[in-house]
């Protein structure tokens, strides 16, 4: 018979050093349970357990007379309550929890408080995951892992006060800037290696290491999170593997697929995938569905794009090895010493990584052909430049000042001839048409332009082929700038709309050279290359439309 919520919680000695997944954007928790896992949260305590009020108790019986008379114990600090905090925005939501930013009223300190519904934990059979994360987090004390500061409860919920990783997921920055330069890749890889060395030294396998589970604190150092699927290897047991299927498809190790087991070396495989993604912008194993991804993993089917850093490539090749006992860093390969001595880390000082200043995040955009040039972009500089994009009478002179400001003029007055002369694959319209002329243009576009089907009946103002880059990979796309405004991009071979660059007041074009131009948005920078060498024309036209939208229409700027 199922226990009531109060009975469940009475059986759970919640410790002040215990935490569930603290990721601001928790990944989906799996439904599999470990063989031998208790169906409920055990009522016993760990090696240094806690009573319900958070006091520490020894697991062994005590003959101390003071402990036999609870009334003689010194008073304990008052447990925190929900009313001690001002709760703010939601940082993330998981399958059975919500993480909320909260400020403690007495100290003004900020925490990421994870809130769990007791009843839902029982109903959805999530007790094993609560137990697992409790056991793992109670063993960790390292700057590269999330920290639990306190726990408390009310009648319906459990609350866990966690360190607030202010800068969010590492994945967010990979998506924003595409690929990291070598200095950034080296530093963050070193921090992950240092964290794994500590974790594996504690006999713990993470089993779901990926950029989503690596957070960045206020100082841009990593904090690894999400231990719901971790495994603690018993020191009394010779078993060095965990026998259950957990993880995320792109980072799953081959032994998990073929033997249904994971080991410490499985985390090293995930490390190899992460290094590859930091440099290339995408994980090494990609396909249309999980089955195809798994097939590529067990066949070791991946390739390095051109301009991949040679030393980083060598390191990845020594980590993405099908035989788990042959991966650099595993116990069979003499542990972490040889891994940390790899030439990729030759400039790293390992002793005090958490006290070092992380390098500024810088995008790496190597030239795609011999007549191009490498481009680098500083993420911090980009964010500071967004401040100059505000539309007001006092700041309009700063808006998009990096590109030309004059509007192109249409030559001649014969609109029919103008329409007739338009190329069906690449052209640019000016913005000086009357409403009747725009109507004629739209009619012509609807009747004869093969790209009209993708633009939601908006008039195309400029279009042409570009190479759209994501990390070190580039794909040919048809870029369509329309009224609205919109920036659509289409697969020209399969004739499929692939996406849209989001317009906002903060959007900013930037020409890097004749071919390469960026479109900066708050959440991502789009890297584009015009094969005709007219990047400046794209920037000029995007600027025109931006100005018409936000300077000619002040109401749009405040929406």
Swiss-Prot record:
Phosphorylation on Ser-244 in the activation loop is required for full activity. PDPK1 itself can autophosphorylate Ser-244, leading to its own activation. Autophosphorylation is inhibited by the apoptotic C-terminus cleavage product of PKN2. Tyr-9 phosphorylation is critical for stabilization of both PDPK1 and the PDPK1/SRC complex via HSP90-mediated protection of PDPK1 degradation. Angiotensin II stimulates the tyrosine phosphorylation of PDPK1 in vascular smooth muscle in a calcium- and SRC-dependent manner. Phosphorylated on Tyr-9, Tyr-376 and Tyr-379 by INSR in response to insulin. Residues 462-553 form the PH domain. The keyword Glycoprotein does not apply. Residues 35-44 have a biased composition (Low complexity). The modification N6-acetyllysine is found at residue 307. GO terms for molecular function: 3-phosphoinositide-dependent protein kinase activity; ATP binding; phospholipase activator activity; phospholipase binding; protein serine kinase activity. Keywords: Acetylation, ATP-binding, Cell junction, Cell membrane, Cytoplasm, Kinase, Membrane, Nucleotide-binding, Nucleus, Phosphoprotein, Serine/threonine-protein kinase, Transcription, Transcription regulation, Transferase, Ubl conjugation. It holds the Pfam family Pkinase. The active site is at 208 (proton acceptor). Its EC number is 2.7.11.1. Disruption phenotype: Mice show severe pancreatic hypoplasia at birth and ensuing hyperglycemia at postnatal stages and die of heart failure by 11 weeks of age. Highly expressed in heart, brain, liver and testis, also expressed in embryonic cells. The modification Phosphotyrosine is found at residues 9, 376, 379. Homodimerization regulates its activity by maintaining the kinase in an autoinhibitory conformation. NPRL2 down-regulates its activity by interfering with tyrosine phosphorylation at the Tyr-9, Tyr-376 and Tyr-379 residues. The 14-3-3 protein YWHAQ acts as a negative regulator by association with the residues surrounding the Ser-244 residue. STRAP positively regulates its activity by enhancing its autophosphorylation and by stimulating its dissociation from YWHAQ. SMAD2, SMAD3, SMAD4 and SMAD7 also positively regulate its activity by stimulating its dissociation from YWHAQ. One of its GO terms (biological process) is cell migration. It is a peripheral membrane protein. The modification Phosphoserine is found at residues 25, 244, 396-397, 399, 401, 413, 504, 532. The modification Phosphothreonine is found at residues 357, 516. Residues 25-83 are annotated as: Disordered. Homodimer in its autoinhibited state. Active as monomer. Interacts with NPRL2, PAK1, PTK2B, GRB14, STRAP and IKKB. The Tyr-9 phosphorylated form interacts with SRC, RASA1 and CRK (via their SH2 domains). Interacts with SGK3 in a phosphorylation-dependent manner. The tyrosine-phosphorylated form interacts with PTPN6. The Ser-244 phosphorylated form interacts with YWHAH and YWHAQ. Binds INSR in response to insulin. Interacts (via PH domain) with SMAD3, SMAD4 and SMAD7. Belongs to the protein kinase superfamily. AGC Ser/Thr protein kinase family. PDPK1 subfamily. Serine/threonine kinase which acts as a master kinase, phosphorylating and activating a subgroup of the AGC family of protein kinases. Its targets include: protein kinase B (PKB/AKT1, PKB/AKT2, PKB/AKT3), p70 ribosomal protein S6 kinase (RPS6KB1), p90 ribosomal protein S6 kinase (RPS6KA1, RPS6KA2 and RPS6KA3), cyclic AMP-dependent protein kinase (PRKACA), protein kinase C (PRKCD and PRKCZ), serum and glucocorticoid-inducible kinase (SGK1, SGK2 and SGK3), p21-activated kinase-1 (PAK1), TSSK3, protein kinase PKN (PKN1 and PKN2). This is 3-phosphoinositide-dependent protein kinase 1. It comes from Mus musculus.
